[in-house]
Amino acid sequence: TDEEKDYVLDVVMKREYATGSIVNTEAGIGMDDRWKAKVFGLRYDDYTRLSAFANLNNLNENQTPGADGDWSPKKQTKGLLTTKQTGLNLNVNNSKKTFSLDQSTLLEWSDKNTVMQRRSETFSKDGSILGGTLSSNDLSDFTLTNNTFINQTLGRFLLSTGHHLVYTDQDDTSLSADSTYQTDIINTDHRRILSTSKRLFGNGHFGLSANLFGSGNTTSLYANYSFN
C-alpha cells in the first residue's frame, strides 16, 4: 500500500489584504441635559497599528478603549463628572522582529461637581432648634499621561527603554455654609477655600541584555529612575 503523505500549504497574504481600518462612533442626548459622544479609529498593516479616540460626556464616565476599540467604562459614583478625553496608541514592529515601539498618549479634561446638603432639628423646652449644612466642591483637572516603550535587538544585544510621564493641573474650589436658628439665626458660618496644584512625575528605565557566549545565559544591566 502507498504510504499516506502529509502536505503543508504555505499561504502568504498579499500586503493589500493585510491592511485595514476601522472607525466606530457613538453619540446621544438625554433628559436633564445629559449628553455623550465618542469616536474610535484604527489603522493597521503588517508592521504598524495606529489607533486614536475621543470621548466627551457628562454621564460620570471616563472611558478609554483598548488597542482594538473595546471600551472599559469607569464610573464616578458621587457628584457630576464631565469628561473630555482624547488619546493615541501606536505599535510598530519590523519584518525581522528586531525592533518594537509601543507608544500611548492620553489627554483628559474633567470637571467634577459635588453638592451635599443636611438638615437637623433639636428639640428643647424653649422650642426646636433647626440646623442646616450646605457644602459644594468644584474640581477642574487636566491630566496628560504618556507611555513609551522601545526594544531594539542588535546581534546578541537587546536594548530596551521605557518611560512613564504624568502631568496634572488642578483647580479646586470648596464652599460650605453652616447655620443654626430658632425664631432667629443663632449662628452662621461661611467658608470658601481655593487651591491650585500642578505636578509632573514619572519613572522609567534603560536596559541592556547580552547573550555573549550563545549558551542561553544572559547578562543584563538596568538603570531605573523616578521623579515627582
Language-model features: locations:
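Feature captures outer-membrane beta-barrel proteins of Gram-negative bacteria and organelles
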Residues: 12-14, 37-43
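Primarily recognizes Gram-negative and organellar outer-membrane beta-barrels
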Residues: 1-33, 48-228
